[in-house]
Amino acid sequence: MSGKPAYKRVLLKASGEALMGSQGFGIDVSVADRIANDIKQARSLGVEVGVVIGGGNIFRGVAVASKGGDRVTGDHMGMLATVINSLALRTSLHKIGVDSVVLSAIAMPEICESFSQRQATAYMDEGKVVIFAGGTGNPFFTTDSAAALRAAEIEADALLKGTQVDGIYSADPKKDPNATRFDSLTHKEVLDRGLAVMDTAAVALARENNIPIIVYSIHENGGLAEILQGKGRCTIVSDN
């Protein structure tokens, strides 16, 4: 691929829902394969890639709490869902010859390695795609927060959030035809306006560590490589 990438190392955050495709639940393997191909294109540009995937296509911890259940147990179940998704993505990457590893915030040595910042950066230095599973390993934190945390730990140049739409809008464009898309915002503007892109803890953590957030549609084939080359349609959240 041609074009010099704007970033050397990035953290990609993908929602669990993105893996569902047109299904109502679970993993659409064709979608996992497409995301894997996008990551392969990014690697062909020389960009080091870390990935955090949500678990909402399988389970959400807040769903337990909303029905009177134990939120901590629910969040633990959600963390396990992210491990399932991470293993699925690793399988898709393996099929196309991309070397990758899953590091979990929850110890499960028979399934994947445990996370450590030092090992994660070492793997990325070797050119491996590192998939971070298990969220932060703690309840009450979203996978958005986990993505911002891992981005800071690996010293990522940018946090890319692949969503259902091509950027940040003033309202849900699927519900409000008058919603306007922003080309750029500051972290403070996102927080002050309460824009639904990532939870406030994630945005604040990215701001504190001077990490730009780039929001784009994960459903565009080759979209990740386009963004990395500064060509794609997106919203950039940065204080610079």
Curated annotation (Swiss-Prot):
Gene3D superfamilies: Acetylglutamate kinase-like. Residues 21-26 are annotated as: Involved in allosteric activation by GTP. ATP binds at residues 13-16, 56, 60, 163-164, 169, 172. It catalyses: UMP + ATP = UDP + ADP. It is found in: Cytoplasm. UMP binds at residues 55, 75, 136-143. It comes from the Bacteria. Its EC number is 2.7.4.22. GO terms for molecular function: ATP binding; UMP kinase activity. PANTHER family: URIDYLATE KINASE (PTHR42833), URIDYLATE KINASE PUMPKIN, CHLOROPLASTIC (PTHR42833:SF4). This is Uridylate kinase. It comes from Brucella anthropi (strain ATCC 49188 / DSM 6882 / CCUG 24695 / JCM 21032 / LMG 3331 / NBRC 15819 / NCTC 12168 / Alc 37) (Ochrobactrum anthropi).
